[in-house]
């Protein structure tokens, strides 16, 4: 009866410790890359095509609501970035309106249970971002949608949200 003969053809692949370590390293780096990418890419915030219009006399602040909380999400704000263009100096201060929403008013207390600096605050569905605008001379200010710096769960980012605004500061 014939017997099987084993022959060495020299084409065998030998795995070394180095190749296993390299594969494990590639896997770890790839996994960390995906985690870091996911942490820096939260879901987009809603933007609005509408433009909020308001007017106020010189030296009297007006409060303009530009962004509302998002259903099902609570953001922990690190800041609010505002870009405004005007024909003269205007002061624009972002504020967090707790428990209410404002379109445009000179008395936000009627609509907000509390008006606070948004930095470090949670931003929920019942809250809104309000811009306080004032000028000591007549002006027209065009304000782009705000950008919120925030953390949500283990994701963080700075994204645009809300509506733009046009505010006219009128002479007395």
What are these regions (language model features)?
Residues 2-172:
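Non-catalytic macromolecular-recognition regions in eukaryotic signaling proteins
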């Amino acid at each position: 009866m014939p017997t099987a003969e084993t022959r060495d053809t020299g084409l065998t692949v030998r795995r070394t410790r180095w190749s296993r370590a390299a594969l494990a390293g590639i896997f770890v780096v790839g996994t960390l890359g995906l985690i870091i990418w996911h942490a820096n890419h939260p879901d987009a915030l809603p933007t609005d095509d509408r433009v909020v219009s308001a007017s106020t006399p010189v030296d009297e602040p007006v409060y303009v609501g530009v962004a509302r909380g998002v259903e099902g999400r609570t953001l922990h704000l690190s800041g609010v970035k505002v870009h405004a263009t005007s024909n003269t100096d205007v002061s624009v201060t972002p504020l967090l309106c707790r428990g209410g929403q404002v379109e445009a008013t000179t008395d936000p207390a009627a609509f907000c249970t509390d008006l606070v600096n948004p930095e470090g605050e949670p931003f929920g569905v019942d809250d809104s971002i309000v811009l306080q605008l004032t000028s000591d001379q007549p002006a027209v200010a065009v304000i782009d949608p705000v950008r919120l710096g925030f953390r949500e769960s283990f994701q963080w980012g700075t994204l645009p949200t809300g509506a733009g605004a046009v505010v006219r500061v009128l002479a007395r």
